[in-house]
């Protein structure tokens, strides 16, 4: 059993965060990291008929175990970047970018869900790499 690093921030999507947390937690120790060690607010998104955009509603709260600045990425087997609105803001955190670059430099598994790819794009680790994302993030990764 090894440790997996799960990234959160205010506005992270509930499903993108909770499902990996609990599923990976069945076999690994999941450590939650964020800009600061505190409680964060997750959000839920719905695709309502007649809307061109998703509707965002408050979801659950989720506590982080560590601040990005205190994370030694060498201690972890894998990295999970949930989607939602959080990546729009998290992608500018230099400590998170350091962590992401470590995982790519060491060829460790990285799971990027939905808008999580925005963090990878800013970290400049996916140039020439085929990735999946949602259509709205297409220009971030091209």
Question: Could you tell me what each predicted segment is?
Answer:
Residues 113-116:
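Short, thiol/selenol-centered motifs that function as redox-active sites or metal-ligating centers
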């Amino acid at each position: 059993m090894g440790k997996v690093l799960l990234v959160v921030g205010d506005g992270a999507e509930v499903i993108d965060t909770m499902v990996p947390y609990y599923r990976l937690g069945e076999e690994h120790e999941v450590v939650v990291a964020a800009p600061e060690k505190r409680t964060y607010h997750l959000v839920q998104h719905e695709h309502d008929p007649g809307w061109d955009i998703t509707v965002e509603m408050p979801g659950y709260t989720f506590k982080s175990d560590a601040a990005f600045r205190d994370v030694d990425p060498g201690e972890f087997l894998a990295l999970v970047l949930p989607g939602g609105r959080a990546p729009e803001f998290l992608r500018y955190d230099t400590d998170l970018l350091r962590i992401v670059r470590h995982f790519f430099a060491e060829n460790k598994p990285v799971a990027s869900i939905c808008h999580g790819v925005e963090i990878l794009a800013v970290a400049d680790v996916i140039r020439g790499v085929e990735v999946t994302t949602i259509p709205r993030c297409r220009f971030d990764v091209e």
